[in-house]
C-alpha cells in the first residue's frame, strides 16, 4: 500500500510524518518532531527521517506535501524564520521522492477541512453549508492566517491570501483610540488587521487598556505586559494573551474588556472577509485561539459584529462557522494534500 509523507515546517519545530491513504481520511503511521534550527536544510532532515522510519513503515512515500511557514511561488519557498530556501523539484531529487509539493502552512488547511471528524472540530454557529460554494478559513494565532477554498472537480483548491495585512478599520471611538495608540507605541505608519486581530493583538489590546487605566502599573497584568513588550518576538517571550484570557475567565474587569474588544474586532473582520469571497461553503476558525476561546467565539461579542453588515446581514445569517480544535491539523492537512497528488 502507498505511503504518504507530510511535513509541517516551522521556524522552531518541524513535524514529519508518514501516513497511509486510508478510506475517508489518511491514517497516521508514525510521526517525529525535529528542532528546525538543528538542521542546515530540510532535505537532510527528510533523508534522515526516511532512513529510520521508511523501513518501519514499509517503503518510500509515493507523494509528499510540506506545509511551510512562508509564501510559496512556482514551487519555491523562502521560510520566514529560517535561512532555508526550499524547492519542490530539488527536494524530490535529493530525497528520492516521486511527487513533492510545497504549500503555505495556512493554505494547506483547506485540503484537510473536508476530512475532519467531530473530534477535530467544534461548532461555533449553526447554518447551512453549500458544498458548491467557496469556503473561508481564518486563524488567529501569532498572526492572522487567511485562505480560501474553491470547489473543483478534483476537490478543493486552496487560494492563499494576504488579507490579514489590509488596513485595520476602526468601528468605534475605542477602536480608533486603540489604533492611534498602536501607531505611536509600535512606531508604525499604518496598522494592519493582524496587529489587532491575532493572539498577539489580544496582548496589544490589553496593553492599551493598561496604559489608559493603570498608567502606574498597579494592575496584576501590568508586570507581565511590560515584560512581554520588552521581550519583543524572542523565543522566551511570556504568553501575555493567554494570561489575559485567564484573567478574563476569572472576571477581571480590564481583561474581560480587552477580550470583548478583541472578539468584536475578530467577528467584524470575519464578516467582512466572508462577504468578500461569499463563503457560503462555510467559515472555519483555526489558529491557536480557536479552541482556547471557544466560548467567546460563540458569544454575542463575536457573532454580533460578524452579522452587523447592514443590508448584507441576510447573506451571512445562513453561513455556518466551525472551529478547528485539533493542534495536529497542519500535518493531517498536508497528508490529505499528498493523497490528492496521487490522483
Segments from the language model and where they lie:
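Short glycine-aspartate micro-motif
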Residues: 4-8, 61-65, 101, 135-139, ...
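Glycine-rich phosphate-binding loop of actin/hexokinase-like ATP-binding domains
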Residues: 123-126, 131-195, 199, 294, ...
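Short, acidic Gly/Pro/Ser/Thr-rich loop/turn segments
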Residues: 14, 71-73, 143-147, 204, ...
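Short, electropositive alpha-helical surface patch
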Residues: 117-128, 203, 338-343
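Short beta-strand-loop/turn "lid" adjacent to the catalytic site in phosphate-handling enzymes
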Residues: 54-102, 107-122, 137, 291-295
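ATP-binding/phosphotransfer module of carbohydrate and carboxylate kinases, centering on a glycine-rich
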Residues: 1-58, 180-343
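Residues on a specific face of well-ordered alpha-helices
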Residues: 44, 89, 108, 142-146, ...
